[in-house]
Amino acid sequence: MILTVKPLQGKECSVQVTEDEKVSTVKELVSERLNIPANQQRLLYKGKALSDEHRLSDYSIGPEAKLNLVIRPVGERTGASGTAASSSSSSQGRVWQTVSTILARHFSPADAAKVHEQLIKDYERSLRQLSLDDIERLAGRLLHPDGEGMDTSYMD
């Protein structure tokens, strides 16, 4: 099958693969065609990041599919940097602690724990369901709050 790989900025390329190929193989083919090292590539399908060790069939990627390519800056690790991760983790911990404190004021300890647990599950589910389009819209709203020079007709 033929897949189209489109960088966020730049020319797209097509690669011929089977549905049993691993994502890492697709990255190697893209590397040959676009001269972008595989370790700097992040492939997305329908807004979801693809993991190197998984097969295309694991993501139900079929013929004629279009993958988006995000190019990582040189030196950026696959995961978040240690400082950013710990900072984000500690601020997230503070948020959940604040939520827990507020719930404790209004519910019994058992009920507060249930509500707290459900809030965390719902939050994590919502994050997993974010697509690249959702993130781009959010970024556009944050970076251009006045909507200057931006087509806002598609925004809800």
From Swiss-Prot:
Subcellular location: Cytoplasm, Cytosol; Nucleus
GO molecular function: protein-folding chaperone binding
Keywords: Cytoplasm, Nucleus, Transport
Biological process according to GO: post-translational protein targeting to endoplasmic reticulum membrane; tail-anchored membrane protein insertion into ER membrane
UniProt KW DNA damage keyword: no
KW rRNA-binding (keyword) present: no
Function: As part of a cytosolic protein quality control complex, the bag6/bat3 complex, maintains misfolded and hydrophobic patches-containing proteins in a soluble state and participates in their proper delivery to the endoplasmic reticulum or alternatively can promote their sorting to the proteasome where they undergo degradation. The bag6/bat3 complex is involved in the post-translational delivery of tail-anchored/type II transmembrane proteins to the endoplasmic reticulum membrane.
Subunit relationships: Component of the bag6/bat3 complex.
Name of the protein in its database record: Ubiquitin-like protein 4A
